[in-house]
Every structure is written in structure tokens, then in C-alpha cells.
Amino acid sequence: MVLLESEQFLTELTRLFQKCRTSGSVYITLKKYDGRTKPIPKKGTVEGFEPADNKCLLRATDGKKKISTVVSSKEVNKFQMAYSNLLRANMDGLKKRDKKNKTKKTKAAAAAAAAAPAAAATAPTTAATTAATAAQ
């Protein structure tokens, strides 16, 4: 994984989006980063380790190429503005969900479910009434 500066990360992320525009996906993760490069031991605590600054670790991959950057709390506003503009520019291929078909299907299913018990309840009553009238 390549650790880049913020500006380089954004340019490489733009390249990843362009490469995956026709087919493929770009996966982006964001998590809090405390500066550790080694895993935390299971038992006990690490003595004398205090993170000096809150940081965010951003990673992006297309499945083959991986890039990452660390953004400090001082730079987060500037980075977030550039990052949001980049996402707006490159996520134009997203499609809105078709809500009309979903609501029609659920209404039809609900109507059928409501009609089935009502029909079953009225059918014996109608048959009993018909049998009673035929017997007289």
C-alpha cells in the first residue's frame, strides 16, 4: 500500500475513478488513525503511548492498486472540501432507485394478502347460506 500526501492522494483517487468509470468499483475506507504501525498487544497496555494529534486514515483501492493517506485534524477542513468536490465530480454514474415499482409491488402484495383471508372467511359463509337455502 502506498502512503501518499493529501494532494497526491486526491490526484491518484481521480485516476482510479477514471479507470473504473466504464466498469469496476472503487472502494474507499475511512477510519481513525492513532499513529501506530504495530498491532496492539492482546494482554496489557502499551506504556507511554499517547497520540499527539487526532488523525484520519483514508484508503482507496480498485482491487489491484491500493493508495492511502493520513489527514491530521489541522488539515481536515481543507481536505474534506477537496474530497467532497472530487466525489461529486466522479460519482455521476450512480442511478436513483426506482421507487414506483417497489411501491406498486408492495401495495399489490398487501392487497392480495388482505383479500385472501377475507375471501376465505366469506367463502364458507356463502356456501353455508347456499346449502341452507337449497335444503329448504
Curated annotation (Swiss-Prot):
Where are the stretches annotated Disordered?
116-136
Q: Which GO terms describe its biological process?
A: cotranslational protein targeting to membrane; protein targeting to ER; SRP-dependent cotranslational protein targeting to membrane
This entry carries the following GO cellular component terms, namely: cytoplasm; cytosol; extracellular region; ficolin-1-rich granule lumen; nucleus; secretory granule lumen; signal recognition particle, endoplasmic reticulum targeting
Q: Kindly list the places in or outside the cell where this protein is found, as annotated in its UniProt entry.
A: Cytoplasm
InterPro entries per the record?
Answer: Signal_recog_particle_SRP14 (IPR003210), Signal_recog_particle_SRP9/14 (IPR009018)
The signal peptide stretch is none
Q: Sites of the modification Phosphotyrosine?
A: 27
Family designation:
Belongs to the SRP14 family.
Q: How does it assemble?
A: Heterodimer with SRP9; binds RNA as heterodimer. Component of a signal recognition particle (SRP) complex that consists of a 7SL RNA molecule of 300 nucleotides and six protein subunits: SRP72, SRP68, SRP54, SRP19, SRP14 and SRP9.
Q: What's the protein called, per UniProt?
A: Signal recognition particle 14 kDa protein
Please report the organism this UniProt entry assigns to the protein.
Homo sapiens
User: What gene is this protein translated from?
Assistant: SRP14
